[in-house]
Amino acid sequence: GHGVRWVFAPSVEAVYPQAHATRIVVAGPALGFEGDLRPGHFTGVATVVCWLFQAVPAHAAYFGAKDWQQTRVVSRMVADLGLPVEVIVCPTEREPDGLALSSRNTYLSPADRQRAVALSQALAEAAGLWLTGAEITPIESAMRATMESAGIGVDYAAVVDSESLGPVTTGAAVALVAGRLGTTRLIDNRLLPPRGAISR
């Protein structure tokens, strides 16, 4: 009913054969944030996605924007290796109150579910401050304060270049947040438009 014609579901052995010795290591956008908090994660992502692109040649591959860093890692890998596939980033789907849809949301207690909306609220606040011309450090502090006031353990709250995930210069930026509620860890982001010379 969803227009799906085929599902490719290889065995673990097919994807990771015995004596599997090759890894795809992406630097650049894989450094920092999730790359620091989950060592080796993006190497695993890049390796299996590269294998998938070789096993199932496709014109386009669709990735959700909620994991913005992952979209940049995959896009950089595709560009660097000259892979003939277009990476298309799909908008994040959200609950009516703004919380990004995630399978992890089901692990939240009712109280933590109420608090979790502070992630999207922090991003909305960042977007508003960005449009007023606020500097980056105060924006990051405001995001962190919004999350902490809701009882979220903040892993990071940052404004960086939307492509490189490095310091913002004059291009588009992205606000990234990650935090913990109980044993559940959530991430979210919001793109910010270019606005000329930027300072911290």
Q: What feature does the model see in each segment?
A:
Residues G166-V168, V174-R200:
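Short, basic/aromatic-enriched C-terminal tail that caps enzymatic domains
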Residues A157:
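Substrate/ligand-engaging "lid" and interaction regions
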Residues G1-I152, V160, S164, T183, ...:
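Nucleotidyltransferase catalytic core that binds NTPs
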Residues G3-V4, T170-A172:
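Short glycine/proline-enriched coil/turn segments at helix->beta-strand junctions
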